[in-house]
């Protein structure tokens, strides 16, 4: 049923979140300041383009929609990007060490899914690439290919991991066809 599928996905997401947190907390990752700043600048530009309309400023948009200053939002975005970049670095290295390779058909399906799930924001793959490349298709495609490999590495680790939750219970097996809920 759909409820079982949703529950299975929620459990899998909880496992992935726990694994990502564990890996970040137990790894030493150096992010070059210039790289973090470049990613932050790209994020701010993209956020502004997507959200700030009709002559409104980022400052006014953040204040009216989030009750935050630009500095507060920038600090929060920087924290989130730091974890995201650490995840990309860690699982990118795992993909390399585990010899996880690009499957072009699966990658194209991944991009097609992004197009179909975009609620009309994208109508073709080139628009997705351009969006994720901050206007540069080739950079966006490279970024998405890296993300795809990172996600495959996360899936590989999740399949092999023995995840337990705060209450000490093991995560249910989400690889089988059903998920049991109590």
Predicted regions and their residues:
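Extended, charged alpha-helical "arm"/coiled-coil substrate-binding scaffolds
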Residues: 1-182
């Amino acid at each position: 049923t759909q409820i079982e599928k949703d529950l299975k996905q929620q459990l899998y997401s909880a496992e992935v979140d726990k694994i990502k947190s564990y890996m970040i907390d137990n790894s030493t990752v150096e992010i070059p300041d210039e790289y973090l700043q470049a990613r932050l600048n790209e994020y701010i530009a993209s956020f502004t383009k997507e959200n700030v309309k009709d002559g409104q400023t980022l400052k006014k948009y953040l204040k009216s929609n989030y009750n935050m200053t630009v500095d507060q939002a920038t600090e929060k975005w920087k924290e989130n990007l730091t974890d995201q970049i650490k995840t990309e670095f860690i699982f990118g290295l795992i993909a390399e060490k585990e010899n996880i390779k690009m499957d072009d058909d699966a990658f194209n399906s991944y991009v097609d899914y992004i197009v179909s799930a975009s609620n009309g924001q994208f109508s073709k793959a080139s628009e997705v690439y351009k969006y994720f490349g901050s206007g540069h298709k080739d950079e966006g495609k490279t970024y998405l290919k890296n993300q795809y490999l990172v996600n495959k590495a996360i899936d590989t680790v999740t399949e092999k991991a023995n995840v337990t939750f705060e209450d000490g219970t093991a995560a249910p097996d989400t690889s089988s066809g059903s998920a049991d809920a109590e």
